[in-house]
């Protein structure tokens, strides 16, 4: 109830996320969760070797997979930007490519990824407020961003 009240006070009504995007988003976060667990001492799961690059290297998995996801999020934002018309169109297209450019020029550490995922959530808010993202979008992105950022914060290699 407190989270719902807090969200309403911010003007955000968290709606039910459709099951397919929810399932895929959770599945998409699992490599970062696994990487964080490796970085805090979980022994590698040998059965993952045939399917998961960096299956035994938490730092490599975290950095490389995190880069991929940030670039993927730029693509999602680009898709939202295609819905824009009028004065905001140039701005939202420009904002949509910012995560990909950030990855290309600046992401070298898990800390860089942490900043990137935080910034993408701010962009999620912008696109949602402009009604370019679906009504349920923040209900998906907020908990997912918290999980991903927690993995990057607590599970980053030292």
Where are these regions (language model features)?
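Transmembrane helix interruption/hinge and helix-loop junction motifs
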Residues: 106-113, 158
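A cytosolic-side transmembrane-helix exit/cap motif
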Residues: 112-116, 130-145
């Amino acid at each position: 109830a407190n989270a719902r009240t807090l969200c309403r006070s911010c003007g955000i009504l968290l709606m039910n996320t459709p099951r397919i995007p929810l399932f895929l988003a959770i599945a998409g976060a699992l490599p970062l969760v696994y990487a964080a667990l490796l970085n805090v001492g979980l022994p590698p799961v040998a059965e993952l070797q045939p399917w998961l690059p960096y299956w035994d290297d938490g730092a490599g998995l975290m950095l490389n997979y995190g880069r991929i996801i940030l670039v993927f999020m730029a693509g999602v934002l680009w898709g939202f930007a295609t819905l824009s018309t009028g004065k905001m169109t140039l701005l939202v297209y420009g904002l949509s490519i910012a995560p990909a450019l950030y990855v290309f020029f600046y992401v070298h550490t898990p800390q860089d990824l942490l900043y990137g995922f935080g910034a993408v959530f701010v962009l999620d808010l912008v696109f949602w407020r402009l009604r370019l993202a679906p009504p349920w979008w923040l209900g998906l992105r907020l908990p997912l961003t918290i999980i991903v950022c927690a993995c990057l914060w607590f599970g980053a290699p030292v």
